[in-house]
Structures are given as structure tokens and as C-alpha cells.
Amino acid sequence: MIEFGNFYQLIAKSPLSHWLETLPAQIATWQRDQHGLFKQWSNAVEFLPELTPYRLDLLHSVTAESETPLSEGQLKRIDTLLRNLMPWRKGPFSLYGINIDTEWRSDWKWDRVLPHLSDLTGRTILDVGCGSGYHMWRMIGAGAHLAVGIDPTQLFLCQFEAVRKLLGNDQRAHLLPLGIEQLPALNTFDTVFSMGVLYHRRSPLEHLWQLKDQLVKDGELVLETLVVEGDENTVLVPGDRYAQMRNVYFIPSALALKNWLEKCGFVDVRIADVCVTSTEEQRRTGWMVTESLADFLDPNDHSKTVEGYPAPLRAVLIARKP
């Protein structure tokens, strides 16, 4: 059973304490409405051993090592339980010699984002749409005091809790199975990340306002999303699908997105990075065995999706709440 009591205790004496007015009731509702496979996934987490790493590297990767190697039987059991939580999309993780080779090389994204961030040391961070929580561990490695992730996908919660259990039940990062629309205006986080979320929102400007409502004054927003080439008036609104995804609504140019942020009241907005997504960064692996990016691109022209739209191009924008 995945519990949230430790998080409630953690924030009770922090600037996030007012969240406790609504959060426990929301979690209780979520616990009543769990997905049919959730029990199977949570059992996999429960059966994992709680291991405390002898060496833990969150600065350069997410790598845990033991002082003495685990037995072949222990490794096989852990590997089997972790594979019960497939597909693994965001990572990679190296846990006591088990290498979870995820669909996405999320470490590459982190390497692109990190040089543009304000120092994370001592910061309280919100990661919206955090997936398995990979980037939260990297935030902790970069010095963050607390990383809170929200993602309503129940499998991602179980993946996060599995990794946490193998990292000595580390309490510096927490994942809550909520969407951004379920959060009150907390105005508490020093840094808010929204990476790979905006294009899934039917109302992208509303999403930007929701992100702003979570930041303290002078807090920093890190926004990473799909963009298209073009001027400040360019926005792609795909038809039924984009790269086989049905839930893609608005893909602006980086310049248009900068304007959107400024319209929502952000200042010091800058385009930090623009990068084509490669089939080396997102691909099928032994831990994610279904279709991936190569299957979503035109086989004769990788500059286009199978629907004929421009292939995925991703931008990182940094902004400040005044």
C-alpha cells in the first residue's frame, strides 16, 4: 500500500502547510478510484527489498551501488519485479547493477536544461507531469531541498516508489497522483518545472497561469515543450493525431510561446534551448517494447511525422514570476 503520511508530516511545518487543507481529501478520493492494474503494480513495489545504497550518485545520473554485490538470486528477483512495472518511459536508472534502459534518455534533456537554471541549492521544487520521477532525483542531486512531483498516471507513481525504495526510502522527493488543475494556488515553490506537458493541454495559457500560481514571488519557471519553426504568430494545431498522439492540441513556435508567457505576466523570458528530438533520445528498448519515435516518423523523410507534420522539435524556455 502506497501511503502519503510521510509527505503530510514533512510539509506540516513548512510553507506548504496550507496544502493540507485540501490534499488529504484529494488523495483519499484517488485511493478509492484506483486503476484495475494498480494493485498488481503496488504489489511489485511492496515485494521489493528496501535497500540503502553504499554509494548514491544523483548528480551525474541516478545510480545506486551496494558495498558488496547482491546475489544473483536477489538481482533476478529485483529485475523481475521492476519489469512488472513496464513500460519504463523516463530514466535511465542504474540500481545495484540493474540498468533500466528507458524509452527516453531523460538524462540528455537534463543536461540541456541544467546549465540555464538558477542554482537549485536549498530550493523547494514542483515538477508537473513528472513521470517516473527521474528528473526529481536529478534535482535533488543538484542540491534541491525538496522535489514534489505531480502526475496522475498510476504506473508512474509505482515506478517512482519502486526506485525510492531501492534508494533507502529517500524522503527528499515525493510524487502525488494529481494533475495541476487539482492544486490550489500555493504560491510556494521556488522553481516549477513543466516538461512535456503543455502540448497536451486544451488550454495552454490556462496551464501557464496554473504554473504561475504555484511559484513564489521571483520564482523560476522551466518550461519544456514541443515547438515548430516560425515567427511569433506561428502555432500548429494538429488534426486527429500528431506523431500518433491523439491528445496534442497546440504547438507554438518558440517566439509565440515567449509571447504567451509574457501575456501571462512572466518576465525575463528567454529561449534557452531548441533541439530536434532524435531516435537515439527516444526509442524502443528492452524496458519499453512497444512503438516509439522511429515508428511515428515518415519512413522516407524523418523531418516529418507519419501525418506529414514537422518532426518533434523541443524548446526550453525560462521565465520569472515578478
Swiss-Prot record:
Record bears the keyword Disulfide bond: no
SUPFAM superfamilies documented for this protein: S-adenosyl-L-methionine-dependent methyltransferases
PANTHER family in UniProt: PUTATIVE (AFU_ORTHOLOGUE AFUA_2G14390)-RELATED (PTHR43861:SF3), TRANS-ACONITATE 2-METHYLTRANSFERASE-RELATED (PTHR43861)
The protein's name in its UniProt record: tRNA U34 carboxymethyltransferase
Molecular functions per Gene Ontology: transferase activity, transferring alkyl or aryl (other than methyl) groups
Disulfide bridge map: none
Oligomer and partners: Homotetramer.
Binding site for carboxy-S-adenosyl-L-methionine: 90, 104, 109, 129, 151-153, 180-181, 195, 199, 314
Function: Catalyzes carboxymethyl transfer from carboxy-S-adenosyl-L-methionine (Cx-SAM) to 5-hydroxyuridine (ho5U) to form 5-carboxymethoxyuridine (cmo5U) at position 34 in tRNAs.
Homology family: Belongs to the class I-like SAM-binding methyltransferase superfamily. CmoB family.
Organism per entry: Citrobacter koseri (strain ATCC BAA-895 / CDC 4225-83 / SGSC4696)
InterPro entries: CmoB, Mo5U34_MeTrfas-like, SAM-dependent_MTases_sf
Gene Ontology BP terms: tRNA wobble uridine modification
